[in-house]
């Protein structure tokens, strides 16, 4: 396994639909206060704001744990979530003391992630109608993994479920949180790749991967089928979108070549979240064999193409 990524959860073959996932949102799943208080987080945030005055704080969902429930008629996944923030993420997962915090969490709570913000991300193994996976070259201007290759993705937003004010656990029903989790990955594809929503299938959850370069932050990785060909996707991407500034190019890799992507030079260019998405995608052969897919035409584009 690549040291930059680990797999926390592998969903049953073929992935899980929105109806097969549930959420328990509770303050018990929030980050523990740091030993000695959270002043270090405040100091890191103030320093970062001085260097990058355009950054802003925002609430995020925190992944505490995930449980597959095998006793139900169909496979069910229960996600135990809390609330956290981007500010706390920078002050814990991205802090120079992240390794020490993991050691202390294990010693104090039996959980190495106890003191970490661990905001839950989302990512997509997006497959075109002619059987190519879609990747994006990240801009040098983004805060995380600048210049590396990623899959479309981002974060589910607690704020999307609130009309205003600070999101509170009691105001966020589990069903709405699940809906936001699944809809957010589609929204990220629409914003980053500039694709119409009606061209995208309902997401299937493949599993959860952890970015070990940011102290084990988790990301839910999904499979999404697009009804457009790779050339049609490229055309939409090049016409620009709401988050066009976050990437500088689009890359297409033929799905049959993805199984051996770790053996290519491209693997070293992938950011950890993309590596997690590919590792999980490769563990779901039913999706690669065409089960549940729309009709696929033969690829006419090269196996690897980059548009700068």
Swiss-Prot record:
The superkingdom of the source organism is Eukaryota
**Domain Nudix hydrolase positions:** 117-284
Main EC class of this protein? Answer: hydrolase
Entry annotated with the keyword Metal-binding? yes
Q: Which InterPro entries match?
A: NUDIX_hydrolase_dom (IPR000086), NUDT22/NUDT9-like (IPR055295)
Tell me which cofactor or cofactors this protein depends on. Answer: Mg(2+)
Q: Pull one GO CC term from this UniProt entry.
A: nucleoplasm
Task: Report the EC number(s), separated by commas if there are several.
Answer: 3.6.1.45
Q: Does the keyword Secreted apply?
A: no
Residues at which substrate binds: 56, 86, 138, 143, 150, 155, 157, 273
Short sequence motif named Nudix box, residue ranges: 174-195
The catalytic activity, as recorded, is: UDP-sugar + H2O = UMP + alpha-D-aldose 1-phosphate
This molecule's function is given as: Hydrolyzes UDP-glucose to glucose 1-phosphate and UMP and UDP-galactose to galactose 1-phosphate and UMP. Preferred substrate is UDP-glucose.
Q: Which family does it belong to?
A: Belongs to the Nudix hydrolase family.
> PANTHER family attached here?
URIDINE DIPHOSPHATE GLUCOSE PYROPHOSPHATASE (PTHR31835), URIDINE DIPHOSPHATE GLUCOSE PYROPHOSPHATASE NUDT22 (PTHR31835:SF1)
- Name listed for the protein in its UniProt record: Uridine diphosphate glucose pyrophosphatase NUDT22
Q: Which organism is it from?
A: Mus musculus
Lineage, uppermost ranks? Eukaryota, Metazoa, Chordata, Craniata, Vertebrata
